[in-house]
Amino acid sequence: MILIDTASLIVGYLLGSIPFGLILTRLAGTQDLRSIGSGNIGATNVLRTGRKGLAAATLLGDALKGTAAVLIAASLGGPEAAMLAALGAFLGHLFPVWLKFKGGKGVAVYIGVLLGLFWPGAIVFCVLWLATALTARYSSLSALVAAFITPIFLWWFGHLALASLFAILTLLLVWMHSENIKRLMAGTEGKIGEKK
């Protein structure tokens, strides 16, 4: 089991490291995504290129790589391996080996691993994100609100191990959004649909 757990963590990391935003924008012939807007490789920054289809594809790719990592590990090693794969995929997205450990902020892959581990939690996350986005128009704030509530939701329904895992992922997600939080507090954070 130790071998399977270790392999799940590593494979999860490698899958999580795939930079779909960068790959798709390069294939589409746009400029280097890291030189646009926030410089992030995630779907929100892809949206700033004006390519909504590419942004949606990036969101889907980043989410599904997390889901795939979880489902593969679960089939081979059970729940513990699946959670390790989820952690690996999340860390891989944040710190991809292919991009000198400078990756995305983790929102899509957070949704993806949650979908693989407990799909009702992913639905709750998306509903909370959408509700906040429609009212506040800030992608970062929407993600933070949904991520804060997710571990509480998991704990409430008795999934203590998952609640602990997602509490850790939420702390990492908050850390990755530290600059966004500063801009939110200063009133300078860009709203959804705005180009920087």
From Swiss-Prot:
Record keywords: Cell inner membrane, Cell membrane, Lipid biosynthesis, Lipid metabolism, Membrane, Phospholipid biosynthesis, Phospholipid metabolism, Transferase, Transmembrane, Transmembrane helix
Bilayer topology term: Multi-pass membrane protein
GO CC terms, sorted: plasma membrane
Class of enzymatic activity (EC top level): transferase
Top-level lineage group: Bacteria
Principal subcellular localization: membrane
NCBIfam families in UniProt: glycerol-3-phosphate 1-O-acyltransferase PlsY
Subunit structure: Probably interacts with PlsX.
Protein name: Glycerol-3-phosphate acyltransferase
